């Protein structure tokens, strides 16, 4: 009898183990299914965002503000869009409100809470050549690591690539840095955001004049003073000054638009200054990389730009018209300081052709967070990169409400 009971107990134990294994297998299958469906829901959210961005693509010359339809879509993650049994929450933000890592200058880097080692190493990573800066690093350093690799020596591909650079740690990138010592800083602002929230890639904007046409490229080889006078709507003598100055530059090219502002008869003339800011460019491209949109950027980002003090940055943000700055020359009402106007000519804009789509897809109890970079290419919103976050708290990092407070059934639209 004892033997029979022991045998029965063994069988029951085996059945229990088998049942537990089966339950685990079912749970795993359900989790995988929910993970897949949540990601599909997030991807659907990205596609939904593209339809909203089409209005910007249809009028790329118009100013871009966060109060536009695309900017209020999803109520900063507070609205849930239901598709079948799944749902997604989303937010679209202007990518041109950030500093572009592939165009950021040493002077701008110096106004971020970074050490000289981090600045030198970043520039060495991005630039060609094998001679490191004093506190930087090239292949000799990276090849000596336990897992060796080479310097990029080119454009960064992702923001998280920063973590491969000497001196750049997760703490530096993701946490607010308040104790960084950098004697090269020209501003004294107290950081309130992590560097990760201030920088990006592929930050594009449009170079259009008030009529919606491409700005006049003052570096165009065959551009005459008469043509510049007509196109930019400035007196012939000012146009002649600009063309003559261009012709004595190295390679007969201006390297910065601000060089024009400092020419005789230009900087002190408000009418001509407006034309320089609104109607001139130094590139043939209608799409420009690395300019900051004053309609969407925070004062913290703006004050990183040399020549743009914290007071002026706050004035730009606080003085924004309800429908945004229409033309860059409107900054003249904020300040006539020449250092600021020099910065404005080289680094600021009122448009954008690049956006970040933040989306959280949900299926069952599972959520998947994605962030897509969308650029306007040939009047079509185009996804150029999608990243799935390794953080479990992305809605919190995006400062979203914990839960949505409104629901939209897309099936009924």
Segments predicted by a language model, with ranges:
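Compositionally biased linear targeting/interaction segments
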Residues: 1-413
């Amino acid at each position: 009898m004892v033997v029979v009971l022991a045998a029965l107990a063994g069988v029951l134990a085996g059945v229990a183990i088998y049942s537990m294994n089966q339950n685990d297998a079912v749970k795993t299958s359900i989790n995988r299914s929910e993970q897949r469906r949540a990601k599909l829901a997030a991807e659907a959210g990205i596609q939904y965002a593209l339809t909203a961005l089409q209005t910007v693509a249809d009028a790329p010359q118009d100013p871009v503000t966060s109060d536009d339809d695309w900017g209020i879509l999803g109520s900063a993650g507070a609205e849930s869009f239901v598709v079948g049994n799944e749902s997604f929450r989303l937010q679209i933000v202007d990518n041109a409100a950030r500093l572009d890592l592939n165009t950021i200058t040493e002077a701008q880097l110096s106004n971020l809470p970074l050490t000289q080692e981090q600045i030198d190493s970043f520039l060495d990573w991005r630039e060609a050549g094998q001679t490191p800066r004093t506190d930087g690093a090239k292949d000799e350093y990276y090849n000596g690591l336990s897992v060796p690799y080479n310097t990029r020596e080119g454009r960064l591909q992702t923001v998280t690539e920063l973590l491969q650079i000497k001196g750049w740690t997760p703490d530096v990138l993701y946490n607010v840095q308040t104790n960084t010592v950098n004697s090269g800083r020209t501003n004294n602002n107290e950081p309130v955001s992590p560097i990760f929230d201030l920088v990006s890639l592929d930050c594009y904007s449009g170079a259009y004049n008030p009529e919606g046409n491409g700005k006049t490229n003052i570096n165009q080889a065959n551009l005459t003073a008469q043509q510049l006078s007509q196109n930019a709507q400035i007196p012939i003598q000012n146009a002649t000054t600009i063309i003559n100055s261009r012709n004595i530059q190295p390679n007969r090219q201006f390297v910065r638009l601000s060089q024009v502002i400092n020419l005789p008869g230009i900087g002190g003339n408000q009418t001509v200054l407006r034309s320089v800011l609104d109607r001139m460019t130094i590139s043939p491209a209608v799409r420009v990389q690395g300019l900051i949109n004053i309609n969407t950027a925070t004062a913290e980002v703006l004050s990183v730009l040399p020549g743009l003090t914290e007071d002026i940055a706050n004035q730009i943000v606080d003085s924004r018209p309800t429908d945004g700055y229409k033309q860059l020359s409107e900054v003249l009402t904020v300040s006539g300081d020449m250092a600021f106007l020099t910065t404005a000519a080289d680094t600021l804009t009122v448009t954008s052709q690049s956006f970040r789509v933040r989306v959280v897809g949900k299926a069952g109890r599972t959520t998947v967070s994605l962030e897509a970079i969308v650029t306007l290419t040939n009047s079509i919103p185009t996804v150029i990169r999608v990243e799935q976050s390794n953080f479990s708290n992305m809605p919190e990092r995006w400062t979203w409400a914990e839960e949505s407070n409104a629901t939209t059934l897309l099936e009924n639209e």
